[in-house]
């Protein structure tokens, strides 16, 4: 289950938030964020809510992005997990299971939520974007994947005061993943090692 959650969001990667003009719509803010952000690091908290209303699964950690294509999504609590994208491959490491899953980046990201943040600026190629009104003090944009096999019905991104503060993922099984970002740094210098991964000795490597 924990591995499935990480694979769904992949990176769901994340970002540093860009101050924008207050009158800009949420879609415009998303485009401006992508245009002006090359690297980002932040902390996140995440809750996965099932369709049957069971207690949400909570987790927290850190993210780093270097656009295009590189990301690092590290869950620290309650169970360590790591997703690293080096631009060519996506590595998913579960220390408790001693397992590493590796996939080609293009196949893994495609129309996934990770593509919204770590990909190039050509969002309309993979997503239909629209302003989705205001709620919880944020202006929202809905991103609906054009591919029918993305595994997601839509992704929502929330802006507050011109900053991108939230991300919500609605999957095909009725689960909702809510992500909130804090301590965001936009365009920091990130060491190259941030986006490199070598499977630890003894780990079971599955995939490409």
UniProtKB/Swiss-Prot annotation:
Residues 1-24 form the signal peptide. Belongs to the LolA family. Monomer. It is found in: Periplasm. Keywords: Chaperone, Periplasm, Protein transport, Signal, Transport. Its main location: periplasm. GO terms for biological process: lipoprotein localization to outer membrane; lipoprotein transport. GO terms for cellular component: periplasmic space. This is Outer-membrane lipoprotein carrier protein. NCBIfam families: lolA (TIGR00547). Pfam families: LolA. The gene is lolA.
């Amino acid at each position: 289950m924990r591995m499935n959650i990480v694979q769904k969001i992949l990176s769901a990667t994340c970002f540093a938030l860009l101050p924008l003009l207050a009158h800009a719509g949420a879609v415009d803010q998303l485009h401006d964020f992508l245009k002006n952000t090359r690297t980002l690091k932040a902390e996140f908290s995440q809750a996965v809510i099932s369709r049957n209303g069971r207690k949400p699964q909570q987790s927290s950690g850190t993210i780093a992005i270097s656009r295009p294509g590189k990301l690092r999504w590290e869950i620290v609590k309650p169970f360590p997990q790591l997703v690293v994208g080096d631009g060519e491959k996506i590595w998913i490491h579960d220390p408790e299971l001693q397992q590493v899953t590796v996939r080609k980046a293009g196949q893994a990201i495609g129309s996934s939520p990770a593509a919204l943040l770590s990909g190039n600026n050509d969002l309309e190629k993979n997503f239909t974007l629209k302003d989705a009104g205001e709620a919880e003090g944020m202006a929202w944009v809905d991103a609906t994947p054009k591919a029918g096999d993305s595994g997601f019905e839509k992704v929502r991104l929330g802006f507050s005061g011109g900053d991108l503060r939230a991300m919500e993922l609605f999957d095909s099984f009725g689960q909702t993943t809510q992500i909130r970002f804090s301590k965001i740094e936009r365009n920091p210098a990130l060491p190259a090692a941030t986006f490199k991964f070598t499977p630890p000795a003894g780990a079971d490597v599955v995939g490409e």
